[in-house]
Amino acid sequence: MENKKRTFMEDLKMILKGIGIWQKITPTYVPYLILDSIFTCLKPYFPLYMSAEIVNELVGTCDLQRLLILAVIAVAGSFVLSLLSRFSHGKLEAIYELFYTRHQAYLFNAANHFQYEHLEDPEVALSRTRIHSVMNATSAGLPKVIFLTSDILRKLMNVILSVVLTISLFQVAPGEHSGFFGFVNSPWAALVLVAVVAANSFISVKLATRSISKINGALSELAPTNNMIFSYMEAQGTDMHIFKLNSIFLSEFKKHMMRPKWVQVLESAMTSQATGKHFLNLVMKIVVFIFTAAKAWIGVIGIGNFILYQGTVQKFVDAVSELGSNIGELRDNNQYLEETFAYLEMPNNMYKGTLAVEKRDDIDYEIEFRDVSFKYPRSEEWVLRHVNMKFKIGDKLAIVGENGSGKTTFIKLLCRLYDPTEGKILLNGIDITRYRYDEYMGLFSVAFQDYSLFAFSIAQNVAASENIDEDRVVSCLNRVGLGEKVAGLPNGVHTYIGRDYENDGVDFSGGEQQKIALARALYKDAPFMILDEPTAALDPIAEAEVYARFNDIASDKTSVFISHRLSSCKFCDEIAVFHKGHLVQLGSHDKLVAEKNGKYHELWNAQAQYYTDKTA
């Protein structure tokens, strides 16, 4: 993924935007973060400070009563801080865990508002996969914003506490000192120490940022492949077991995930950072030890403070270097935030219409395709070309044609999942793009061939809502021929589909699931009913039953019916025949089958020949 160059202010705005989304997802996070940062910072400094006070008392007046009080304060204070730190940290950990679930829900909710073309767009799907994969592999994106912000807040508090506790280290002792001790007692020594600390921090930040960038880059490239490989384990687990594909799977895993290139990048990045950091820490410890020892020798600080400053200055150095590293990592993380924001803010141009769909008592609606042509986004190939057609409420229209002829695309345009590339679709003479999108969509009940049922109750699947009219659900199930089966289940319509959420859920056959999808289309009770291969998964007896009930199912609605089985289209008022994206014929079954040179006649005879041969 390309890491664009941004100014510090641009990065800061993006980070603050990420924190804002975090706050929306987990509103209780910030208060616990502040508390945890305070307790976490005080926890190591408090024992250091109390130890220094105890040592100073031991080498000073050695008052036993004061020593006892200091010891009690040290032990009790450390215990209380430890309890408070564990409490706040436990709360944060729980929020962290909750965040991942809510983060998924947040992305899912955003996707619910996408245009349909974005849901089908491979680039959008790849972006969604990258967001999930990188987050799972490295916590990059929104999770890392808050993790690093938490660290930065703690490091800032560490720096402030360190400065407050070590301020006396830079005082100048009275009296004359020559040579090295004279230099240590001068302001120049303080400047040199500050310069050494700054140089140490700068180099540490550079090492860490370079290492993190390499590691994140390698892991982000590996993450989609990693997710894909492990998804195969879930989806194809049965085949792997039956056909003994484990060795092939393991070989592919090693080939893709254990490439020398990635291993070398990760090892090199981690080793160089660890070695560099170890060397810098050693140099810093030597410098701090010499400086504080010299200050103690000339009497600027006491022996107890020598111990305090040794620990405090080192913590200051660590905090500053890690602070810079965190800031660098946070800025590097913005490349993942940018993709997350682009995904969350994907525009939806379907909601520009402002007209209300007329609520007619006579439900008299007419749909017209006027010279409609269409090609999918990122494609130059026309899928539909110059389609002209009208149909009114109450008509039963069949859409037929060979695979790839444009049937399903025609339905997607009718339902306004896509808008035409050229031409217009009119509802009662008005361009459908001028209507409010939700109201126009409310005109259609659809049962697609590639329908989806969810691991919820039958009632929830049929009603597509938590506000369920149970009698209506039962009625719809009866109309599609599944009422008796559902009534015989222990929990009736409240039986769960599958066992994802409930152990007593039921696994329905493909045909039964298709009937549930049909019942869902009926439950919506919209003026237009669209059925895409509604009997594809049914056995012949069940198929005949559905066709026998079709007049009841469609009743006074406009039904648009897609099928490869032309015999099932005979009951329709009109049949639209598509071929290579063109509407080539329109008429009744008797009319079209009589046109000897027509496409419908060709398709009808081809299927009739198949059944004749099978019978023979």
Regions found by a protein language model. Name each.
Residues 1-16, 97-143, 221-264, 334-347, ...:
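Extended non-transmembrane interhelical loops and adjacent amphipathic helices
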Residues 382, 420, 426, 483-516, ...:
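ABC-fold ATPase nucleotide-binding domain signature/coupling loops
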Residues 217, 244-245, 288, 307-346:
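Cytosolic ends of transmembrane helices, especially the final helix of ABC transmembrane type-1 domains
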Residues 424-426, 441, 459-503, 547-548, ...:
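ABC ATPase nucleotide-binding domain helical subdomain, centered on the C-loop/LSGGQ "ABC signature"
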Residues 43-53, 149-183, 188-209, 262-310, ...:
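A hydrophobic transmembrane-helix motif
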